[in-house]
């Protein structure tokens, strides 16, 4: 046991051989199938966007740590993971300079300003996407497939034109408009299986999050429960972003509460918000509640007497 490191999880503690760099390497491997399908559907431009985002994140982290005389951490691959996740949340037509700005913002403002890996209070890639949505809404919501501008399934559901939805089989394999890494649900499920196999994450947050969205969207009268699950970036957000170690709860009970909150907010934003998608802001809001959730769900120490009024 390394007594020089602070353990942030609740007891009991299980020690494993997985280091941060190994975990991030497996996350990159799990993300790879979605990236391959993004290039398959959108062409080499998708690969270029990925390279720009990853390079912007890695180089900005390197430059910041050099300027501030801090230990270099680009070898832990966390900046590369942030860059790839950001790229997956962007349309393939995004100007490359915007993608680079989003990567720099995610690393410098959201991650490094708060102390680096594990200290950020929200997911850096999602915060970068939120900043880009606020700054360049048109560029961030222009979708193409086979070079033709098209509406996303979520936009069709919100408009009530369910008869124009693509077949569910198309939505499962990704043949629809959307961000370059979010459309192929089969590829994302392969990544989910890899993360479960390596015990990088548990099933609780992704499954509860996705099912909550489907159930609540049905109760809210949207009329397409399966399409609501398969449309947009819900799978990408639930599997890879809502499960971020630094910004998600540490207990199973906390994960359940957190996942339900993410799902409820996503359903509310999709139904009544001005933007058809909702997972970005839902996860960011729930990230801010994680300290409260952890405090409320942390297991009581054996023999501890609960103080009056607490």
Where are the model-predicted features located?
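Alpha-helical transmembrane segments in multi-pass membrane proteins
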Residues: 26-34, 49-61, 78-83, 87, ...
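N-terminal signal-anchor module of multipass membrane proteins
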Residues: 1-54, 58, 303, 309
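Long hydrophobic alpha-helical segments that form multi-pass transmembrane helix bundles
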Residues: 118-189
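Hydrophobic alpha-helical transmembrane segments in multi-pass integral membrane proteins
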Residues: 92, 138-144, 220-224, 264-279
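Loop-to-transmembrane alpha-helix initiation sites
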Residues: 121, 125, 226-234, 255-257, ...
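Membrane-interface helix-loop-helix junctions at boundaries between adjacent transmembrane segments
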Residues: 78-79, 84-147
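Structural signature of hydrophobic alpha-helical transmembrane segments
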Residues: 43-56, 93-102, 171, 175-185, ...
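C-terminal ends of transmembrane helices
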Residues: 11, 59-71, 107-118, 188-199, ...
